[in-house]
Amino acid sequence: MKTLPKAILVDANFIVAYVSPKTSADDKARIEHFLERAEKARSKVIFPMPAIAEFLVRADLAGVEFMNRLDKKTFLHMADFNRAAAFELSQIDRAALNTGDKKDETGAPWQKIKVDRQIVAIGKSLGATLVISADGSVRNNALRVGMIGMTVQELELPEAAKQQKLALVPAKKTRGIRPVLVKPTGGG
């Protein structure tokens, strides 16, 4: 994605990937590069409160401190579920009910469906046009309301992080062939 939108929604999976030591070096580089680009472009990166709560469930005190540090960055926006988000959620739920299936053809537990929709509704109410999530349900809900869905792995990998692939040719073994010693001929 060459140009970042003005408002971008992320979820708990993004937050976990950002802080986890288990995240691959390439994915860490993608996230760092994305955040640098977002700050430079003056995009607003939206961290919805339900996603923050989901992250904090498994985080220790360091997780709270991390969130406090993020809160100080002006391009990061910690977003509540407010009246505008409630309106957007009602539109998402109504569309699902109009199809005759409030779960919208997903087998997920109803509580997960509601939280995923709340996350998307918060982003939609703040003008997000892109969501970054590893959760297919969040991305699908985002698509239904006209947002683009991406995973961390689909973010641009910065040039500095790209490893040069060397084509190494294995050495051939020469079984049964002995080197021949060639003596110089004496010419003089």
Question: What do these predicted ranges mean?
Answer:
Residues 31, 52, 86-89, 116:
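A general structural signal for well-ordered alpha-helical segments in protein cores
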Residues 75-109:
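Acidic catalytic patch
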Residues 14, 51, 85, 118-119, ...:
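Alpha-helix capping/helix-boundary segments
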Residues 54-55, 88, 140-141:
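Phosphate- and divalent-cation-binding pockets in alpha/beta enzyme and binding domains
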Residues 41-45, 74-77, 125-130:
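Short active-site oxyanion
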Residues 1-5, 120-188:
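Acidic, PIN/NYN-like endoribonuclease modules and their adjacent C-terminal/linker elements
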Residues 1-47, 56-73, 164-188:
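Short, well-structured N-terminal submotif of metal-dependent ribonuclease cores
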